[in-house]
Structures are given as structure tokens and as C-alpha cells.
Amino acid sequence: NFTFHVWWHRALFSLEKERYDEVLTLYDTQFRATQTEEYLDMTNAIAMLWRLENRGIDVGNRWEELADLSEPRTQGHLLYFADAHFIMALARGGRTEAIQEMLTSLRQAAQRDDTQCQVIARVGLTLAEAIVSFHEGHFDAAFERLLPARYDVIAIGGSHAQRDLFSLVLTEAA
């Protein structure tokens, strides 16, 4: 729902102004008020929660719903941009088994030759491994994986504002 995405952008402005209560209100009442399974709505929510938590903001139990919705999506790989966010939700939701399933599936997909699998081989698997390393507190490993891949992240799609999340992970890992 593109309306929800516009509200997500509005929340980014509030985030930059450090109005965290406002961000959470927009999350709950606007761009995640309807808990859809549509990938754009999910990626908006996942990216915002990740940004908030990395600023030390308690997001309560909001990860649970997103991890629940991400868990059955460890195999499809229709759009790597979404996969990168799903693995974030799985990590923050503590879904260790699903993370391993997704990493295994991504490794297998990287061997195939369709467009999304080429993206996975070029940057996606590295990005997923870096996200997991970061979440586990292995910041040096996350940094070492992300640094050489930083200019290839554009291949996953999304806007500059959406892909900026991965630059933030790199910066925070450093």
C-alpha cells in the first residue's frame, strides 16, 4: 500500500529529529496499523524498527508479528530486497532456525542463473550474512562483509532512503 509507504517516509523525518514517540505512533496508527503481509508494508516496518532499535529505542514486542510473517518466506527469493528485510525480522525476532533455513536457501539460490539469484550471488548472500553477524554482535565480521559490498547494494532495488538502512548497518558495525 503506497499510502503506508508515504507515512513511512514521514516517520523517517521524525526519526531524524529524534522524535521517537512520534515515530512509534506513526508506526502503530499509520504505516503498520493494518498488519498486512504485503512485502512493501513489511519492509517499511522492519526497516523502521531496525533503525529505532539501533538508536537504543525499545520497540516492545513489535518484532514478533514481523518475524511470524517472515518465517514462512525463507525459501521464495522472488525479490531479494524483501529477503534482506525478512532476515532482519527473523534475527530481531530470535528465529534462529528460520535464519539458518534462509541462509541455506540463499546459498542454493546463488548457484542458479535467474535475475534475483544473480543479485543474491552478487551481493545478497553477503548482505544477509552481514545482517546476521551484526545482530549477533559480531560487528567486525559484519563490517568485513559489508565494506566490499557497499557499492553493490543498489542491485537489490529499492529507493535511496530504503537502501540507506544497509549503509547504516555498515556505519554502526564500524
Describe the residue ranges of each PLM region:
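Internal metal/ion-chelating core segments
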Residues: N1-K17
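Helix-coil-helix junctions within alpha-helical repeat/solenoid scaffolds
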Residues: L12-A174
